[in-house]
């Protein structure tokens, strides 16, 4: 019985590259077959077949079938050790949740698995599944639920010895706080995660996630793009080594850093590099267009890139936030360059030169006047911008302060001399 299953499993593996459907059918037949619990070889083959089938279903985008497999194998989990059962459930659930083809059943399936783990009194598995649920809540923007479950889980994990899972949950807490724009708490959670991670061996995926979040926090809070770039590069190498779909995201953030560092010419070199070449596509093309627009200081090209690659640029909150700031800086530079030769200029003329609507130009100019980027007023009645010369700086206060400081030094010197005489 076991020998036949081994032969079938080997045949399924040999068909992986040529005929995936046939391989899936063979693995299905092995998984559905009843086996004796005391037949160790048959149990091992069935376990390998379940993992291989799950991986194949994920690669072929069969999300519903993978969800069904996760429920179907539960009776079999009682015939293997708790550690193996936990690894099997986690692996299948990770495959299901990492798929691009969302079914809308992710949270429901995760909750079902948690309930099953509770009923079977599998504490470690339940905690691992709850960590995945926190991740799901974060992905679906249910931030308050993510924080509530995460804080409960952190209290439990700090009393136990599963440091890797503790790092995972601390990272999720940092991501959630960052999404809620609470940067001090996001940084504190990240620092806790890095401290915990220093004491253990981190698997490549966890280390890459840690580097990715470090890069995001450095970019968001400190605008330290050089440090952020090095973190994103480490994350990219980590994700690339395990063929994770998140590798492309870290590559996009690397390209974003180069644009924000005002070195858009490096973007082309990065994209055509050996490591990044396999990720060529719309995601990298989007950043290449933004880099070109930034290099040319062209608002029209920038807006075209944002329109043509809406999903790739606007749907990513990290990229969207920083590109909005880049666009703002680019607009200010363009406006200052346009108005520089004038002392009085029509707003319509400015809007025609930089190819933006009159209302947008008016709004931006009034903001720049309030921020003291230049001195002037908007005459909305006549639709003109009047620019004043830079007012001379009154140096009376500086001179007075300098005089007082010098007098203070003289008084101190006289006091010290008088002290020596007495």
From Swiss-Prot:
**What does the UniProt record report as the effect of altering residue 272 to A in this chain?**
Does not affect phosphorylation by AMPK
Question: Phosphoserine: which positions carry it?
Answer: 14, 23
The UniProt record lists the PCI domain at: 224-392
Known InterPro entries for this protein?
26S_Proteasome/COP9_Components, PCI_dom, Rpn6_C_helix, Rpn6_N, TPR-like_helical_dom_sf, WH_DNA-bd_sf
- GO cellular component terms given for this protein: cytosol; extracellular region; ficolin-1-rich granule lumen; membrane; nucleoplasm; nucleus; proteasome accessory complex; proteasome complex
Q: Name one GO biological process term.
A: proteasome assembly
Where is the cross-link described as Glycyl lysine isopeptide (Lys-Gly) (interchain with G-Cter in SUMO2)?
Answer: 274
Superkingdom, natural source: Eukaryota
Q: Where in the cell does this protein reside?
A: Nucleus; Cytoplasm, Cytosol
Which keywords belong to this entry?
A: Acetylation, Cytoplasm, Isopeptide bond, Nucleus, Phosphoprotein, Proteasome, Ubl conjugation
- Report disulfide bridges, numbered on this chain: none
The GO terms this record gives for MF are: structural molecule activity
PTM annotation, UniProt: Phosphorylated by AMPK.
Tell me the tissue specificity: Highly expressed in embryonic stem cells (ESCs). Expression decreases as ESCs differentiate.
SMART domains in UniProt: PAM (SM00753), PINT (SM00088)
Q: What does this protein do?
A: Component of the 26S proteasome, a multiprotein complex involved in the ATP-dependent degradation of ubiquitinated proteins. This complex plays a key role in the maintenance of protein homeostasis by removing misfolded or damaged proteins, which could impair cellular functions, and by removing proteins whose functions are no longer required. Therefore, the proteasome participates in numerous cellular processes, including cell cycle progression, apoptosis, or DNA damage repair. In the complex, PSMD11 is required for proteasome assembly.
Q: Its quaternary structure?
A: Component of the 19S proteasome regulatory particle complex. The 26S proteasome consists of a 20S core particle (CP) and two 19S regulatory subunits (RP). The regulatory particle is made of a lid composed of 9 subunits including PSMD11, a base containing 6 ATPases and few additional components.
Instruction: Report the sequence similarity comment from the record.
Output: Belongs to the proteasome subunit S9 family.
Any idea what this protein is called? Answer: 26S proteasome non-ATPase regulatory subunit 11
């Amino acid at each position: 019985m076991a020998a036949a299953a081994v032969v079938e499993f080997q045949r399924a593996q040999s068909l992986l590259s040529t005929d995936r459907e046939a391989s899936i059918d063979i693995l299905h037949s092995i998984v559905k077959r009843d086996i004796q619990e005391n037949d160790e070889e048959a149990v091992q083959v069935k376990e390998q077949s379940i993992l291989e089938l799950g991986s194949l279903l994920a690669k072929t985008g069969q999300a519903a079938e993978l969800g069904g497999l996760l429920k179907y194998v539960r009776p079999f989990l009682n015939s293997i050790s708790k550690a193996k059962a936990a690894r099997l459930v986690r692996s299948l659930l990770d495959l299901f949740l990492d798929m691009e083809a969302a079914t809308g059943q992710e949270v429901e399936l995760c909750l079902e698995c948690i309930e099953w783990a509770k009923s079977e009194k599998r504490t470690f598995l339940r905690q691992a599944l709850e960590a995945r649920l926190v991740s799901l809540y974060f992905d679906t923007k249910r931030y308050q639920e993510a924080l509530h479950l995460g804080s409960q889980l952190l209290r439990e994990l700090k009393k136990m010895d599963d440091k890797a899972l503790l790092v995972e949950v601390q990272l999720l807490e940092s991501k959630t706080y960052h999404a809620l724009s609470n940067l001090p708490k996001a940084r504190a959670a990240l620092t806790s995660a890095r401290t915990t991670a220093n004491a253990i061996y981190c698997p490549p995926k966890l280390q890459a996630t840690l580097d990715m979040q470090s890069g995001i926090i450095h970019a968001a809070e400190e605008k330290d793009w050089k440090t952020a770039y090095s973190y994103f590069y480490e994350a990219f190498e980590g994700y690339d080594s395990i063929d994770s779909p998140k590798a492309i995201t870290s590559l996009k953030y690397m390209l974003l850093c180069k644009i924000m560092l005002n070195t858009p010419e490096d973007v082309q070199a990065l994209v055509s590099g050996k490591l990044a070449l396999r990720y060529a596509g719309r995601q990298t093309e989007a950043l290449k267009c933004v880099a070109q627009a930034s290099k040319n200081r062209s608002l029209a090209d920038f807006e075209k890139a944002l329109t043509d690659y809406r999903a790739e640029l606007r749907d990513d909150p990290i990229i969207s936030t920083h590109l909005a700031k880049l666009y703002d800086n680019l607009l200010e530079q363009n406006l200052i360059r346009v108005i520089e030769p004038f002392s009085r200029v029509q707003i319509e003329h400015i809007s025609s030169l930089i190819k933006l609507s009159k209302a947008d130009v008016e709004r931006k100019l009034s903001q720049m006047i309030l921020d003291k980027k230049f001195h002037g007023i908007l005459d909305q009645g006549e639709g003109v911008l009047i620019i004043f010369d830079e007012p001379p700086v009154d140096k009376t206060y500086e001179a007075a302060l300098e005089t007082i400081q010098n007098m203070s030094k003289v008084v101190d010197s006289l006091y010290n001399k008088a002290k020596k005489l007495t």
